[in-house]
UniProtKB/Swiss-Prot annotation:
Gene behind the chain: ppsA
EC nos: 2.7.9.2
This protein's UniProt keywords: ATP-binding, Kinase, Magnesium, Metal-binding, Nucleotide-binding, Transferase
Cell inner membrane is among the record's keywords: no
PANTHER family listed in its UniProt record: PHOSPHOENOLPYRUVATE SYNTHASE (PTHR43030:SF1)
A Pfam family assignment: PEP-utilizers
Active site residues of this protein: H442 (tele-phosphohistidine intermediate), C774 (proton donor)
Species: Synechocystis sp. (strain ATCC 27184 / PCC 6803 / Kazusa)
Top-level EC class as recorded in UniProt: transferase
Catalytic activity of the protein: pyruvate + ATP + H2O = phosphoenolpyruvate + AMP + phosphate + 2 H(+)
Remarks, miscellaneous: The reaction takes place in three steps, mediated by a phosphocarrier histidine residue located on the surface of the central domain. The two first partial reactions are catalyzed at an active site located on the N-terminal domain, and the third partial reaction is catalyzed at an active site located on the C-terminal domain. For catalytic turnover, the central domain swivels from the concave surface of the N-terminal domain to that of the C-terminal domain.
Protein name: Phosphoenolpyruvate synthase
Family (UniProt): Belongs to the PEP-utilizing enzyme family.
Record: residues binding Mg(2+): E703, D727
Length: 818
């Protein structure tokens, strides 16, 4: 401990101490050392015994800053500078900021402050076995404002950070620059914007032992999903080298989601892994003129994840520990924004900063606000969406911060990346688009905080979008955001959840896109009645499972090349690509609604649709009528497909057994006979999905007349039914729903179809089996939903956009029925 090197300051003297060690401060000391340093001290004191590694160090106090300002007589001079400041006048702001910083830099530290810093740095050198000569121990010097990291406002990046500082003279110079950084243009603007008095804020400087992540990796993590506010997932970003590139958005990092509830139970629930380009890394400038420099990352390193699964899980565990601790200290749920680093010399992971998250934690959980784009046009750029909203205006392409005076309020900012110097104009933008950055970069954090839609990591937006052209930025269509040409029509819907009634009938949701699942988690639904695997396979996997299993036998050279590129991380085991991607997609949906039931329908492509997957034509027959051909259950046990179905089973088993998401219920589609059902269940058992084991239930789609007529027999095989009204309608009426010639006859409200539905519900209930519906009918026709409630159906699964209005209608029906 540091106490073996220096004496700890007594409580009585903390208020007037110039230096305090991290071990001496905690969350109650924000006024003394700022949010950043008090948080480091809190973690060192309270969490190291729980296995959380935090590098040690010391802080200059807020008292030291005020003492410096007072001793030098600077306060009145600074006040005079800001008497008639106009923060919206960029030239005025830049001039006043420059004069304020120069005033501080031109004024030397008092001798006793220099001595205090020198003694503390000397003690750190001694602690790490180095002498304080021309060089000493390498440290990070970071500013920490006394108003920083309060939960209501993020001052992230408002002041300066200096890495690889390794001599006393450099430490003193960096501390001086940190003091001056209290008056950077962005900090002045930010305080004004958030209503902070410039002179009520003081500055503390943290001097912390460097973690040698220049030789390894680093990143940012949040103990909450930054986009949707979903509380049960930790988001981790990672890139090579020092962490500044991730924070500033200079690099597109890898991203990982981990599910916190089952992680705490000992499972390994990595929900998603997304590879970033990681083109550059920040390293020590050994022998150079600067402290750090950026170098290119070698191609093989870019094309693999930069931390392994155990490190992902370890970081997520720490995120849980840190969040739980701060929530306990504050007496209210407190999601955290955390910076981490891996030491390349020791292989150890460290937490180097932690602060309360400042956007999602402030939002009302009782209002759902959704944006719907009504038109589409040419797509100019795509990237990661930030904030599920839509913005539009004239594009302003700004390639350098020196050009920000060209920006006008209401324009769409298009740039390479942002850092805190850009903030004075960011708050004036209707939307922000950057070439670089991930979901935790500076542009993303500030855009979220200001409620501005942003798209980051586009790659080439500054080339494909021209200054002056009208654009619409859409972040409401999932994880990928799009920049559209022109001003497009859109609608905004707001729903107050606190007044919604509860219904006896379970209201479930149909969810296909895993990227939207966290956003749907706040809807008033009792789970998922239909999670479609087709979306995941078509959009995330893209290749036919047999094309992955028999890659060397592929005859189509174009498909083979595309699959090779798609699966380059899996060159030695391409089927694992299918299992990983499918498991991640299922897990994202299951986690969003955990522990509520999530019914996952096994793949139900028709043979012509399977053929359209990469490499698929080689493995699929040409059928005259694929709608009623080789689909659903009949494929799963067929010698020509069973090994591909095994991959689906492996993915499902991983989600349930390794991730702990036992709320997943597999459902078999298009099962023509009870005997066919038994064959499929036997096939699943071969791959570890044994009915009844670990609470596993298996449902069947009730979508064929035979499912209804033989419902007693199907009840002996399956644990529940879900009526598929689309197929049941076409097969009851004997028509092809894809044919425009007979489309006018397709109607779920037909008396014959309704009798089928009635018979299915009555037979299932007589056999003690659950029965719901997941077809389109209840979403499209409120009177059909009423019909189902009157029959006593257990659950109705709806499209997300129908949930709210249908809940109200069903509540009325239930009330009328008494």
């Amino acid at each position: 401990m540091v106490s073996s090197v220096v004496e700890k300051t007594s409580v009585a003297h903390k208020e007037t101490a110039l230096i305090l060690w991290f071990e001496e401060v905690g969350t109650h000391d924000v006024g003394l050392v700022g949010g950043k340093n008090s948080s480091l001290g809190e973690m060192i004191q309270q969490l190291t015994n729980k296995g959380v590694n935090v590098p040690s160090g010391f802080a200059t106090t807020a008292y030291a800053y005020r003492y410096f300002i007072q001793e030098a007589g600077l306060e009145q001079k600074l006040r005079d500078l800001f008497t008639d400041l106009d923060v919206n006048d960029m030239a005025n702001l830049q001039e006043r900021g420059h004069l304020a910083r120069q005033l501080i830099l031109d004024t030397p530290f008092p001798q006793n402050l220099q001595t205090a810093i020198a003694e503390a740095y000397g003690a750190m050198c001694e602690r790490y076995g180095q002498k304080m000569g021309r060089t000493g121990v390498d440290v990070a010097v970071r500013s920490s404002a006394t108003a920083e990291d309060l939960p209501e406002a993020s001052f992230a990046g408002q002041q300066e950070t200096y890495l690889n500082v390794h001599s006393l003279s450099c430490v003193l110079e960096s501390c001086h620059k940190c003091f001056a950084s209290l008056f950077t243009d962005r900090a002045i603007s930010y305080r004004h914007h958030n209503g902070f008095d410039h002179f009520a804020v003081a500055l503390s400087v943290g001097v912390q032992k460097m973690v040698r992540s220049d030789l390894a990796t680093s990143g940012v993590m949040f103990s909450i999903d930054t986009e949707t506010g979903f509380k049960n997932a930790a988001l981790i970003t990672a890139a090579y080298g020092l962490g500044e590139n991730v924070v500033q958005g200079a690099v597109n990092p890898d991203e990982y989601f981990v599910f916190k509830p089952t992680l705490k139970e000992g499972f390994k629930p990595i929900l998603e892994k997304r590879l970033g380009s990681k083109a550059i890394k920040m390293v020590y400038d050994v022998g150079g003129s600067k402290l750090t420099k950026n170098v290119e990352v070698a191609e093989p390193e870019r094309e693999k994840y930069c931390i392994n699964d155990e490190e992902i899980l370890q970081l997520a565990r720490w995120a849980c520990i840190i969040e739980d601790h701060y929530s306990g200290v504050r007496g209210v749920y407190t999601p955290m924004d955390i910076e981490w680093a891996k030491d390349g010399q020791t292989g150890e992971l460290f937490i180097v900063q932690a602060r309360p998250e400042t956007v999602q934690s402030q939002k009302s959980a009782n209002v759902i606000k959704t944006y719907e784009l009504k038109d589409h046009s040419q797509v100019l750029a795509t990237g990661r969406s930030v904030g599920a909203a839509i913005g539009q205006g004239k594009a302003q392409v700004i390639r350098n911060v020196s050009q920000i005076n060209q920006f006008r309020p209401g324009e769409v900012l298009i740039t390479n990346r942002t850092d805190p110097d850009w903030e004075p104009i960011m708050k004036q933008a209707s939307a922000i688009v950057t070439n670089q950055g991930g979901k935790t970069c500076h542009a993303a954090i500030i855009a979220r905080e200001m409620g501005i839609p942003a798209i980051v990591g586009c790659g080439d937006a500054t080339d494909t979008i021209k200054t002056g052209e009208d654009v619409t930025i859409c972040c409401s269509e999932g994880d990928e955001g799009s920049v559209y040409s022109g001003i497009l029509n859109y609608e905004v819907h707001e729903t107050e959840l606190s007044n919604l009634p509860r219904t006896k009938t379970q209201i479930l949701m149909n969810v296909g896109n895993p990227e939207q699942a966290f956003g749907f988690a706040s809807y008033p639904a009792d789970g998922v009645g239909l999670a479609r695997l087709e979306f995941i396979i078509a959009n995330h996997i893209k290749a036919h499972p047999l094309a992955l299993m028999k890659f060397d036998e592929l005859e189509d050279p174009l498909a083979k090349a595309e699959i090779a590129e798609l699966t380059k991380l899996y060159a030695g085991d391409r089927p694992r690509f299918f299992v990983d991607k499918l498991a991640h997609g299922i897990a994202m949906i299951a986690a969003a609604f955990y522990p509520k039931p999530v019914v996952v329908r096994m793949s139900d492509f028709k043979s012509n649709e399977y053929a359209n997957l990469l490499g698929g034509r080689q493995f699929e027959p040409k059928e005259e009528n694929p709608m009623i051909g080789w689909r659903g259950a009949s494929r799963y046990y067929d010698p020509n497909y069973r090994e591909a179905y095994a991959l689906e089973c492996q993915a499902l088993k991983r989600v349930r057994d390794e991730m702990g998401l036992t709320n997943v219920i597999p459902m078999i589609p298009f099962c023509r006979t009870p005997d066919e059902g038994r064959k499929v269940i036997a096939e699943m058992a071969k791959h570890g999905l044994k009915q009844g084991k670990n609470g596993l239930e298996i449902y069947v789609m009730c979508e064929l007349p035979s499912n209804v007529i033989l419902a007693d027999e199907f009840s002996e095989v399956f644990d529940g039914f879900s009526i598929g009204s689309n197929d049941l309608t076409q097969l009851t009426l004997g028509l092809d729903r894809d044919s425009s010639l007979v489309a006018h006859l397709f109607d779920e409200r037909n008396l014959g179809v309704k009798r089928m539905v009635k018979m299915a519900i009555e037979t299932a209930k007589a056999n003690g089996r659950k029965i719901g519906i997941c077809g389109q009918a209840p979403s499209d026709y409120p009177e059909f939903a009423e019909f189902l409630v009157e029959l006593g159906i257990d659950s109705i699964s709806l499209n997300p956009d129908s949930v709210l209005k249908t809940v109200l209608r069903i509540a009325e029906v239930e009330k009328a029925l008494g």
